[in-house]
Amino acid sequence: MAQVEYRGTGRRKNSVARVRLVPGEGNITVNERDVREYLPFESLILDLNQPFDVTETKGNYDVLVNVHGGGFTGQAQAIRHGIARALLEADPEYRGSLKRAGLLTRDPRMKERKKPGLKKARRSPQFSKR
């Protein structure tokens, strides 16, 4: 008999997370490492668990994540987005609560490109009067 699993893809900035939810005890594995070993800050782990708190499914699923690109914050938010999408696939009833919490919306903010003649995206070179 095939094991039931739900998949979701989450994105944020330059991070892409492929998430699989499998019925279990609530273990979270990121890139084949424990989440507490992979993410350095407790606040990111709390952020990542938000979809489970909203849907009251904490401890019902094991989470297997493959994530690449970006930094810790972007990756944590991409994982959160992927978990929310996978939960929606598991039970469409969760759509209302996930939508109200803003967890199904892909955050479109990206790093602004550097322009020629400027030091950064908007920072101009220092002006010297003389």
Swiss-Prot record:
SUPFAM superfamilies, sorted: Ribosomal protein S5 domain 2-like
Biased composition (Basic residues): 111-130
Region (Disordered): 98-130
Coiled coil: none
Alphabetized GO MF terms: RNA binding; structural constituent of ribosome
InterPro entries recorded: Ribosomal_Su5_D2-typ_SF (IPR020568), Ribosomal_uS9 (IPR000754), Ribosomal_uS9_bac/plastid (IPR023035), Ribosomal_uS9_CS (IPR020574), Ribsml_uS5_D2-typ_fold_subgr (IPR014721)
GO BP annotation list: translation
Keywords: Ribonucleoprotein, Ribosomal protein
One of the record's GO cellular component terms: cytosolic small ribosomal subunit
Alphabetized PANTHER family for the sequence: RIBOSOMAL PROTEIN S9, SMALL RIBOSOMAL SUBUNIT PROTEIN US9M
Family: Belongs to the universal ribosomal protein uS9 family.
Identification of the protein by name: Small ribosomal subunit protein uS9
